[in-house]
Amino acid sequence: MAKPIVAIVGRPNVGKSTLFNKIIGHRISIVEDQPGVTRDRIYAEVEWLDHYFTLIDTGGIDADTEEIIPAQMREQAQLAIETADVTVFMVDGRAGLTTSDREVAEMLRKSHKPVLLAMNKVDTSNRLDSFYEFYELGIGDPIEISSAQGLGIGDLLDEIVKHFPENKGVIYDDDVIKVAIIGKPNVGKSSIVNSILGENRVIVSDIAGTTRDAIDTPFNDGEDQYVLIDTAGLRRKSKIKENIEKYSVIRSIAAVERADVCLLVIDATEGVTEQDTKVAGFSHENGKGTIIVVNKWDLIEKDNNTMNKFIKEIRTELAYLSYAPILFISALTRQRMPKVLETVKFISNQRAMRVPTGGLNEVIGEATLLNQPPSDKGKRLKIFYGTQGSIKPPTFVLFINDKKLMHFSYERYIENRIRENFGFEGTPIRFIYREKSGRD
């Protein structure tokens, strides 16, 4: 089941990124005392009292100029309404209530989704005046916090997890293959959905951000049940051009959470972009099957080496997806489209595959003989044995003498040997290490 999504919204410089960093426990966003400075990662996985959720910092889509702040805040609120299960509406207790605060509060109230009002900067004076002022918003009791000092953060998190839905979204049977179509706007995601379905079930336009909602489309190919999850575009075209791609990253997060296999759609006319790397990273980190789909291949002038050049670029820019197959298609002309669903089915089976413990340990033993494990200060890594702990993604438990001796490069080596012998194409592989002595 997908993890709940929590969005922090509010006007620039109220402390959204500081709160985001305080909650996740380390500083990954750029924080300065100027509006519009968050330029880095905008999501993180959070655990609080055995509740797991995805936290989104909409500070990553703040405007840089005061003139467009009201419009920007409305877009933030709309994003939260469409995507988040719980919205934290952050206001500045020092500055007091603003017209923009009132406008966004009205939108959030109409959404009928849980909204928590966080009054920041309570470590300053005159907070009581602001406290009662914010009751005008009609969102409920302000939760007093100081994101800079860490005051009240635990109370806020307690309230957040209380409002999580019991069932996150539609629950499909385990045998239904859930496929998320992800990628930046205007790469042809909806056209791919339509081509797979063979009918026009999703509105398609050449204008980025015209898909009206995230649309789940169940269908049967005669053998298996599928659900295509088409990530939503903007409900309306953003007034700020740069926001469109950032919004779609956040919407992709929600789709990836629910998926078994992700189709990462790349525009052949543009190549791999920064946003492609962000969305691809989220799919990889969440253990999803991934297929890299290069769309609009019909628009590319080709010679004998064109495809190889594209493959090299993709493997360089998305090196962590070395396991992901690459398909070159045209949703418009249906070039190689039958291969897409065929590959989805194959990757889904690869994610669910189990290998025998005996065969696994033969591969590991042979690998350690061919390439001796690393050592440090005279102590050498020993892999006593391994077993497959789980599937989706395939996860292996290795019993070793010292976790600190397992270098990333050697883990990659073991992973490659496992892939060479058993497959697992299109899916990440995870390792869990358990320490034991040779006498155990």
From Swiss-Prot:
Q: Please verify whether the record's keywords include RNA-binding.
A: no
What Gene3D superfamilies is this protein classified in?
Answer: 3.30.300.20, P-loop containing nucleotide triphosphate hydrolases (3.40.50.300)
**Domain named EngA-type G: residues:** 4-168, 177-352
- Keyword Cell wall biogenesis/degradation attributed: no
Q: Name one Pfam family in it.
A: MMR_HSR1
Q: What does this protein do?
A: GTPase that plays an essential role in the late steps of ribosome biogenesis.
**The protein, known as:** GTPase Der
Lineage, please?
Bacteria, Bacillati, Bacillota, Clostridia, Peptostreptococcales
